[in-house]
Amino acid sequence: MSQAIPQVGVHSEVGKLRKVLVCSPGLAHQRLTPSNCDELLFDDVMWVNQAKRDHFDFVSKMRERGVEVLEMHNLLTETVQNPAALKWILDRKITPDNVGIGLVDEVRAWLEGLEPRALAEFLIGGVAASDIAGAERSKVLTLFRDYLGKSSFVLPPLPNMMFTRDTSCWIYGGVTLNPMHWPARRQETLLVAAVYKFHPAFTDAKFDVWYGDPDRDHGMATLEGGDVMPIGRGVVLVGMGERTSRQAVGQLAQALFAKGAAERVIVAGLPNSRASMHLDTVFSFCDRDLVTVFPEVVNRIVPFTLRPGGDARYGIDIEREDKPFVDVVAQALGLKSLRVVETGGNDFAAEREQWDDGNNMVCIEPGVVVGYDRNTYTNTLLRKAGVEVITIGSSELGRGRGGGHCMTCPVLRDPVDY
């Protein structure tokens, strides 16, 4: 079993990254086809073996810098060896709403008969009608396969699990279990919640769950981790655009304030666009006082602040900011200003590099980031500003529109003095 994490908590965007959760490409990405990739939120199919090599390189480069990397398939394999954990997952995943009333017993029995490693792979990679052996196939499953085809899914794959940033957010001393925006991603949170609830690496750690519950219908409230940045000094940045809704932002702020976990939430109103689906696609920290931004979007952000107070019923005071977003962030950190590196190249190159996650950097310590190799203009500008840019291959990993920041969920990160 993996060693227990003695401590969890993310206290900045740039402090030394100690522990991080990732999810390697696998069966879910082998299930991507030209006919289903759009529904599964990928722009194209992947060359999966190359994606695995590039992701392994990404993990290796973080480990070389002293980061402990936790991998989701491994954690889930170990989690389902606990009978209580397996029951908890299957009770919630194998339901009439998910697989159909006639398939619950058969699909559950088939999954329970798998070895832990294979079970974890299918929980993330999905179950096709053809996966369940013919001798065990019921009349209902046979009709399902004959009508919809052998490549139809009893349980859909979760290829976006690779972007571990989104399903949960470690904010200071606690975590959120995020209700995701698109149906293709909503089942991811259940698996992450199971790991946090049952895996020894987390059961031995003390933390609060600030917001989110896989057993609850959150309605119009959606929250994704690419929009959430605990930056220090009790401040949390939250993007509000395509993926994160105002309903979730208010509830998250309310929960953080009620437990004294944060003093201020700065909300970044974003355009509703896939290119800027999360705040971290247009804005990320690369050093304690340096950010990289896509100005076409960041200059249009509508910033406002939530603080404890105001209406006694809700405990939140709201204020529209009269300064640009970057200036508001600098002021919140006690800085006169932030150094800004814009997406590089001319207008055409900048738009391309933003699309290819040029602003989606993950900081592994102050002034050291990991990003995609293809964003040569932006990487060069960051290096000229004194940032060490460690590059990884991008041709396959980027097909789901996520870079180094998206592919990492920090679990333990040091604070930064401001």
Swiss-Prot record:
Biological process (GO) annotations? arginine catabolic process to ornithine; arginine deiminase pathway
Q: Single GO molecular-function term?
A: arginine deiminase activity
GO CC annotations, alphabetized: cytoplasm
- List the active-site residues: 406
Pathway(s) per entry: Amino-acid degradation; L-arginine degradation via ADI pathway; carbamoyl phosphate from L-arginine: step 1/2
Q: Which reaction does it catalyse?
A: L-arginine + H2O = L-citrulline + NH4(+)
UniProt KW Hydrolase keyword: yes
Q: Where is the signal peptide?
A: none
Query: What EC number(s) is this enzyme filed under?
Result: 3.5.3.6
Top-level taxon: Bacteria
Q: Which UniProt keywords apply?
A: Arginine metabolism, Cytoplasm, Hydrolase
Major location (coarse) = cytoplasm
Q: Indicate where this protein resides in the cell.
A: Cytoplasm
EC class of the enzyme, as a word:
hydrolase
HAMAP family this protein is in? Arg_deiminase
The record's family statement is: Belongs to the arginine deiminase family.
Q: What name does UniProt use for this protein? A: Arginine deiminase
Which lineage? Bacteria, Pseudomonadati, Pseudomonadota, Betaproteobacteria, Burkholderiales
Gene field: arcA
